[in-house]
């Protein structure tokens, strides 16, 4: 037999708030997550690439190895390690924060409570972004290191004669010459993170749950691919 659905599913989606609102929340979060990850890892990678290629820095090769090392570790292992570090009850990160922040809050007559990384929406999203930044910055750093090598030193020497500061060099020489070759890779990175199912599934499973989503179970850290 044949059932004619037509536009019924679209009508149901648009008219049912318990389905529409979680979907819109997840869509906005997915776009923000992808964009923040791309530009965040690019910024971290560029800064680190500039530092490890600074001619006055000693042991640059050693620093390069240690900074690229996270890229050699399988992502699912790193995610599971971070899941333990962020554990709300016995994770090392909360223990460290409790040790540091507890006395500071106590000095003002306040009580410090452990951060609920897995049960509160915004801490969970912040955790997702931090873990993804750790996973993504080595890739961006490697790209920036290669592209920085391709920029002629004559340009920097000419601006040095004019008295240009490092900030001016970054704005008018480094970034313009980096963005064009990086653009396709940034778009590819955005698309990858837009569908980053493994990170969400292993770290939070999409949680914490959106209470309003009664007919379509959804979580605050869900991406469209895991919704």
Predicted region positions:
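A structural signal for multi-pass alpha-helical bundles of membrane permease subunits
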Residues: 1-227
């Amino acid at each position: 037999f044949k059932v004619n659905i037509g536009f019924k599913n679209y009508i149901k989606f648009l008219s049912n708030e318990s389905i529409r609102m979680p979907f819109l929340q997840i869509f906005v979060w997915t776009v923000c997550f992808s964009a923040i990850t791309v530009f965040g890892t690019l910024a971290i990678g560029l800064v680190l690439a500039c530092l490890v290629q600074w001619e006055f820095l000693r042991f640059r090769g050693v620093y390069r190895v240690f900074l690229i090392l996270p890229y050699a570790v399988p992502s699912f292992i790193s995610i599971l390690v971070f899941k333990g570090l962020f554990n709300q009850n016995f994770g090392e990160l909360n223990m460290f924060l409790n040790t540091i922040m507890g006395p500071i809050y106590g000095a003002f007559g306040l009580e410090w409570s452990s951060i609920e990384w897995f049960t509160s929406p915004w801490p969970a999203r912040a955790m997702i972004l931090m873990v993804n930044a750790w996973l993504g910055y080595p890739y961006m750093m490697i790209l920036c290191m290669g592209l920085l090598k391709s920029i002629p030193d004559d340009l920097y020497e000419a601006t040095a004669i004019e008295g240009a500061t490092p900030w001016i060099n970054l704005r008018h020489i480094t970034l313009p010459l980096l963005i064009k070759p990086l653009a396709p890779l940034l778009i590819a990175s955005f698309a990858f993170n837009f569908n980053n199912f493994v990170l969400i599934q292993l770290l939070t499973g999409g949680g914490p749950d959106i209470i309003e989503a009664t007919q379509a179970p959804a979580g605050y850290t869900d991406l469209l691919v895991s919704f």
